[in-house]
Swiss-Prot record:
Subcellular location: Cytoplasm
Protein name: Cysteine--tRNA ligase
HAMAP family xrefs: Cys_tRNA_synth
Matching PANTHER family: CYSTEINE--TRNA LIGASE, CYTOPLASMIC (PTHR10890:SF3), CYSTEINYL-TRNA SYNTHETASE (PTHR10890)
GO cellular component annotations of the record: cytosol
Source species of the chain: Acinetobacter baumannii (strain AYE)
UniProt-annotated binding residues for Zn(2+): C30, C213, H238, E242
Cofactor note: Binds 1 zinc ion per subunit.
Quaternary structure and interacting proteins, as annotated: Monomer.
Motif stretch ('HIGH' region): 32-42
Disulfide-linked positions: none
Coiled-coil zones: none
Xref: InterPro entries: Cys-tRNA-ligase (IPR015803), Cys-tRNA-synt_Ia_DALR (IPR015273), Cys-tRNA/MSH_ligase (IPR024909), Rossmann-like_a/b/a_fold (IPR014729), tRNA-synt_1_cat_dom (IPR032678), tRNAsynth_Ia_anticodon-bd (IPR009080)
């Protein structure tokens, strides 16, 4: 189990990870508010924590991964009313869609996926504790607010100071006369007509957004756990508020390490519905294989902002297809033969990259070099070395959740390649014509077939076992 460093958003630097319990990592990631289909920003968060967890488990860590579901929220209520359906009908439909999208992207299911509506009692207990400690107060309108001035460390995650902040800095914050301070945030919302509500000591109502994650995370992982993650947009106010209410309630440190995934931009601007540059995962999957989307996400460091475009996805498809071509070239000669003997130099370099704040950009550079060596070994008919390199590459791509599909199925799919002019069957037919031409000593025809295929993006390689082919990179 190799030590690793990660960027802790709270400390604003990379630090060595020290577990609370030897060999174990407890991780909570903020999930989706299920009122619509997941967008490509959600995909990045899902995929990033998926490959992080896959890598940690490959290193021997026992990771407990919790990702919540917000199934009660203003947007959910509004959308259900617009659609003329119940909240449960709406949320069930979009939870199913979310899980389907995640599976298509190759994401493993979390160990638990708690729903907010299943933890109302625990939320009320935490709110009651905060009121009793004087950190929260009921307002005359039936709401209950957290009093930010009672938590001295408020702002430590985002680096903000209350005195410097202005009300309205976030779309999640409303200036209301019931508040003692503009940044006091709601823990319990009083019931409104035709909205779902639960009985509470403060009257009928429903929980605020921030208290949901504090209650679910501490119920699932305890008052103090290792890693909390989410998108960069959640750092303030959501994660800041989680820290305040959790630590004010329990008196313990809430989380040791905070991880935040970078934004996805479109033409240099943050993706958003208001700008009209918003893409759901399903929108993108109509044009690109889901593993191409995963590759696009994996190929950049999780903290770096990335620019989303068709061009970027086409580049991702080209790069991913190289691995599939290499696997096909190997399998044409050696079948599915693998070995437990792996190339430790490539393993070490890959692990070193991933242990440096999960640097997938550097890890992918290692895989491309390994892929090049595999192609060389296959071409030079070095069977033993080819098998070791193939086995190593398969092992490492598995860790990142890449090259997970049947090679022929991926390469034949319309979204796996640009509907290339020649099908696999047509290529095989041309190869047989070339073999027949060589047997007839018609070398001019054989060379012509090779050149014609090359011009159509197909490379032939003659080996002792026969002719193998691959599509050009």
């Amino acid at each position: 189990m190799q030590p690793f460093v990660l960027y802790n958003s709270e400390q604003r630097k990379k630090v060595e990870f020290v577990p609370r319990k030897e060999g174990h990592i407890d991780m909570y990631v903020c999930g989706m508010t299920v009122y619509d289909y997941c967008h490509i920003g959600h995909a990045r968060v899902m995929v990033a924590f998926d490959y992080i967890i896959r890598f940690l488990r490959s290193q021997g860590w026992k990771v407990r991964y919790i990702r919540n579901i917000t199934d009660i929220d203003d947007k959910i209520i509004k959308r259900a009313n617009e659609n003329g359906e119940t909240i449960q009908q709406l949320t069930t439909r979009f939870i199913d869609a979310m899980n389907e999208d995640a599976a298509n992207l190759g994401c493993l299911a979390p160990d638990e996926a708690p729903k907010a509506t299943e933890y109302i009692d625990q939320m009320q207990n935490m709110i009651g504790n905060l009121v009793n400690k004087g950190a929260a107060y009921p307002a005359s309108n039936g709401d209950v607010y957290f009093e930010v001035t009672k938590f001295e460390k408020y702002g430590r995650l985002s680096g903000r100071k209350l005195d410097d902040m202005q009300a309205g800095a976030s779309e999640r914050i409303d200036v209301e006369v019931e508040k003692k301070h503009p940044f006091d945030f709601v823990l319990w919302k009083h019931a409104k007509e035709n909205e779902p509500s639960w009985a509470s000591p403060w009257g009928n109502g429903r929980p605020g957004w921030h208290i949901e994650c504090s209650a679910m995370s501490t119920c699932c992982l305890g008052n103090h756990f290792d890693i909390h993650g989410g998108g960069s947009d959640l750092m303030f106010p959501h994660h800041e508020n989680e820290i305040a209410q959790s630590e004010a309630s329990t008196g313990e440190q809430y989380v040791n390490y905070w991880m935040h995934v970078g934004f996805i931009n479109v033409d240099g601007e943050k993706m958003s519905k208001s700008l009209g540059n918003f893409f759901t995962i399903r929108d993108v999957m109509e044009k690109f294989h889901p593993e191409v989307i995963r590759y696009f996400i994996v190929s950049s460091h999780y903290r770096s902002p990335v620019n989303f475009s068709d061009v970027a996805l086409k580049e991702a498809k080209t790069s991913l297809t190289r691995f599939y071509h290499s696997f096909k070239a190997y399998q044409q000669v050696y079948g599915q033969t693998t070995t437990e003997a792996l190339d430790q130099s490539f393993i070490e370099r890959f692990n070193n990259a991933m242990c440096d704040d999960f640097n997938t950009a550097e890890a992918m550079a290692v895989l491309f070099e390994l892929n090049k060596e595999l192609n060389r070994a296959v071409k030079e008919e070095q069977a033993d070395q080819a098998t070791v390199l193939y086995s190593t590459l398969r092992h490492l791509t598995n860790i990142l959740g890449l090259v997970q599909h049947n090679v022929d199925d991926f390469l034949k799919s319309d979204i796996g390649q640009d509907a290339l002019a020649l099908s696999d069957a047509e290529i095989e037919d041309f190869i047989q014509q070339r073999v027949d031409a060589k047997k007839a000593k018609d070398f001019a025809k054989a060379d012509s077939i090779r050149q014609s295929l090359l011009e159509q993006g197909v490379v032939l390689e003659d080996t002792r076992q026969g002719t193998v082919w691959r599509r050009a990179d």
